[in-house]
């Protein structure tokens, strides 16, 4: 008989609730919707002495795993203890997020749990992990996910093709979702001298692979009175942030408001002339999807993970090409009618295609397919997903 409600463990994020990064947003959005449907969800948060430790939030249970608060060790220690805790916990499904934490996904698997891994991006390619040990550990996590996960979820066609070509491993393509946001008038942003449509916005983590240096360099040579806002927090990338400030020191049009959230974040999205995401590497960029939901005209690098989100409802430039980025920015600055068109169509397009409610149902359907003696709820699954699950089950029975 099918189990109506499941006990689910989430592992691999920093902490929930938070906007520390895209993974934290994803875990929070999924967990609160799963709880609302009657499932039990436990998020295994990192321990941080400087952060409060509530036992729960919005019906989500919160556990805190030992974390070595030292650069390079926080993620790996929290991932190990998170997977260990989930392995010995009373859970039907353990959902591990990201390749690094997947290094330990064999622990809950060893204890008889069913394990789902979501690859949010090929993290070993990111600039911050480009030392031999870190990159190799993340790559090994990728290999552990391929070997031990009952189901492997990816967010883009490019990642799906990568796992097929590299490992011969079938994956499930289930992109992330985005809420439907209501734009708001400028109030708090006026403290930075910002008004509606008088600035270009980047909003995200301050790390080299996001390409903020391309944007600053392209912008510096544009004859415009529109400001450039580089909004985002700094964790392990203070040196890179200092480099960005040095690049912009002679241009008082460039503003660094730091980490933003709440009303200030909403106002920045709502009133930007255009939003720019110049990334070299992405998983599935939630900030890009949020910008479109708020009604931004978006300009992004042409990597698959961004271009597949935008499609024809935004503008792309060649990755890493500062001249092309400058030309595309100049064109948008000179054509407000084009910008208005993209703004008008972005919210309906992105929210229809990437509803969090639909995404949650698809994840739950995969969970049910992974729980022993249960069949997926096929009415919740697209035909392609049903076919993939059925094929995999037939292969297992045939062994």
Show which residues each predicted segment covers:
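Membrane-proximal helix-turn-helix segments that form the acceptor-binding/catalytic region
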Residues: 84-87, 110, 133-151
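Aromatic "clamp/platform" in nucleotide-sugar-dependent glycosyltransferases that forms part
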Residues: 280
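Glycosyltransferase donor-sugar binding loop
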Residues: 48-49, 178, 203, 227-242, ...
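A conserved mid-protein helix/loop that constitutes part of the nucleotide-sugar donor-binding site
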Residues: 25, 198, 202, 207-221
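Nucleotide-activated donor-binding/catalytic signature segment of Leloir-type glycosyltransferases, i.e.
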Residues: 241-263
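Short hydrophobic beta-strand element within catalytic cores of glycosyltransferases
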Residues: 297-300
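Short alpha-helical donor nucleotide-sugar binding micro-motif in glycosyltransferases
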Residues: 259-260, 267-272
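Conserved acidic donor-binding segment of nucleotide-sugar-dependent glycosyltransferases
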Residues: 315-323, 331-337
């Amino acid at each position: 008989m099918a189990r109506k409600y499941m006990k689910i463990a989430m592992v691999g994020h920093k902490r929930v609730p938070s906007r520390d990064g895209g993974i934290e947003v994803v875990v929070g959005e999924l967990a609160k919707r799963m709880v609302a449907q009657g499932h039990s969800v436990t998020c295994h948060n990192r321990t941080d002495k400087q952060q409060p430790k509530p036992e729960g939030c919005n019906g989500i249970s919160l556990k805190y795993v030992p974390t070595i608060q030292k650069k390079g060790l926080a993620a790996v220690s929290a991932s190990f203890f998170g997977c260990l805790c989930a392995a010995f916990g009373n859970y039907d499904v353990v959902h591990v997020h990201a390749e690094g934490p997947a290094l330990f996904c064999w622990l809950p698997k060893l204890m008889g749990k069913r394990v789902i891994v979501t690859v949010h991006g090929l993290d070993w390619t990111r600039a911050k992990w480009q030392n031999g040990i870190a990159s190799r550990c993340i790559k090994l996590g990728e290999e552990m996910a391929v070997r031990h996960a009952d189901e492997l979820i990816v967010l883009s066609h490019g990642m799906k093709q990568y796992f097929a070509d590299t490992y011969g491993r079938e994956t499930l393509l289930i992109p992330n979702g985005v809420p439907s946001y209501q734009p708001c008038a400028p109030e708090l942003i006026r403290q930075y001298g910002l008004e509606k449509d008088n600035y270009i916005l980047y909003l995200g983590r301050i790390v080299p692979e996001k390409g903020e240096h391309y944007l600053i360099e392209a912008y510096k040579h544009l004859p415009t009175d529109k400001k450039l806002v580089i909004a985002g927090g700094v964790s392990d990338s203070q040196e890179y942030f200092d480099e960005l400030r040095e690049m912009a020191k002679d241009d008082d049009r460039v503003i660094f408001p730091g980490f933003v959230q709440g009303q200030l974040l909403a106002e920045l999205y709502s009133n930007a002339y255009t939003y720019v995401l110049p990334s070299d590497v992405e998983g599935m960029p939630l900030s890009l999807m949020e910008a479109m939901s708020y009604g931004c005209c978006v300009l992004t690098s042409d990597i698959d993970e961004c271009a597949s989100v935008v499609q024809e409802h935004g503008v792309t430039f060649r990755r890493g090409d500062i001249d092309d980025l400058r030309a595309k920015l100049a064109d948008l600055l000179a054509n407000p009618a084009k910008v208005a068109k993209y703004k008008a169509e972005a919210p309906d397009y992105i929210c229809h295609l990437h509803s969090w409610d639909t995404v949650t149902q698809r994840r739950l359907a995969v969970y049910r397919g992974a729980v022993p003696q249960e069949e997926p709820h096929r009415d919740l699954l697209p035909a392609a997903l049903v076919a993939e699950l059925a094929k995999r089950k037939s292969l297992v029975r045939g062994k």
